[in-house]
Amino acid sequence: MGSYLNPGSTAFQGSLRSQIYIDKSGLIEKTNTVLGTEQKYVCVSRPRRFGKSMAANMLAAYYDRDCDTKEFFDKLKISQSEEYLKHLNQYDVLKINMQEFLSATQSMEEMLRLLQKRLITDLKNRYSSYEIEDNLVFAMQDVYANTHHPFIILIDEWDCLFREYQQDKDAQKKYLDFLRFWLKDKDYIALAYMTGILPIKKYGSHSALNMFMEYSMTDPGELAEFFGFTEEEVKGLCEEYAMNFEEVKAWYDGYDLISLSRFGDKRYSIYSPKSVVEAMLRHKFGTYWNRTETYEALKIYIQMNMDGLKDSVIQMLAGEGVRINTGTFSNDMTTFATKDDVLTLLVHLGYLTYNSETEKVTIPNKEVSQEYLNAISTMDWHEVMRSVENSRKLVEALWNQDAKAVAAGIENVHDEISILQYHDENSLSCTIHLAFYFAREYYTIIRELPTGKGFADICMIPRKIHADKPAVIIELKWDKDAEGAIAQIKEKKYVKSLEDYKGNLLLAGINYDKKTKTHTCVIEKVEL
């Protein structure tokens, strides 16, 4: 067993012994299908703490021919696969964490020299009877020619150089050239599997590593379910640890990934695994994933001087989606032509989620929303912070059926934030959602809830642990009247969809008069 060549199963055994272990061995069935084929180059990009390193440790333990890991994998899902035993412990594995080499050196050139030296040392120690060159490519060719066992190459944190040497384009190109020379069109490779946060860097319209099939946050392909926790997995943990699933969903859900295949499309609701595990073990909801980086990282990007960027962030804070074009993103952290490129980067970093069907980005959950507020509180977006801070009072005014205070609070938000200019009821909706930001502490907020004879504009349904709070139906009108909004709620029987809350249900009609530029509000309580 070497440090990098056939490193054994110690790391994977550590995962298996953990208090919480979710079986993701189905990934192995996917990698087995591409071994030794044109599709043997796989690159997975996900945010920090989404299980990328754990997956690499699992693959190393499964393929490593210098150890016997059958007893571990016999208990996992992969053991049900037809080709399970065919590939188990049959390959020479090279497992590398590129960050380790970057941190130990002062330049890209030094990093690559150290990498090659350490890998060649492992090869010579393992195959001391063979004459092995001091060039990594030739050394691996020599070993393969003698053993006829191809290599599984696992590279974790492959993109660390792009994150730490953000401005050094020459170093980035040389690094990509090295990877291409080492990996491309090599018979000694059965599988080249890389993981990182960023997709593979593009220069112009070309990629130096165009042989890789990429699986990212914007296009996860058939690997969507293997990184992060699925909703079913989280439900199981909630039962085991006696945690409220509805609250877990509000805090950590929100990454919507779609797998497209000839066998049928699958939609996954993916949860942040680091956060879910900590919440279960601590038996407490909080911000856990974000501790891996400070809010300063987010702040750098959302305060960039990009046309429309601030407006988009405000819209998303209000719960709206923003349509973007992900195609112009250069897959680095410095090349931004438009706000869409910045927002695409935030998707890959985990600060936004992308819906490939609507092509819209949104803030995924309460945990990440808090990170935006932390960043904005240290910026000059004072009007946004005031609106968020005042939303607590606005929610209380709604509960108290203080219609004048609700109208005044909404008006303040509209007057303070320049992007909230009204053209119709949709633009009024953005103002309402930002004004009632604090309501998310208690409610699941649904836009256009299907009801008796139509769709209610906004419904606030209290989560189970806040069942003492009233459910709320809000109907919006633009240049009409608030009383008419209440009448529409009753006429179209919107109340029917929330009849379980009768006796604790508020109806709110809100209108904006474009002539007087004022808001009016009417609030009624529905009695049994």
Enumerate the predicted regions with their spans.
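Mg2+/Mn2+-dependent nuclease catalytic core
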Residues: 172-177, 478-495
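Conserved catalytic cores of phosphodiester-cleaving nucleases, focusing on short active-site segments
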Residues: 432, 456-460, 469-478, 492
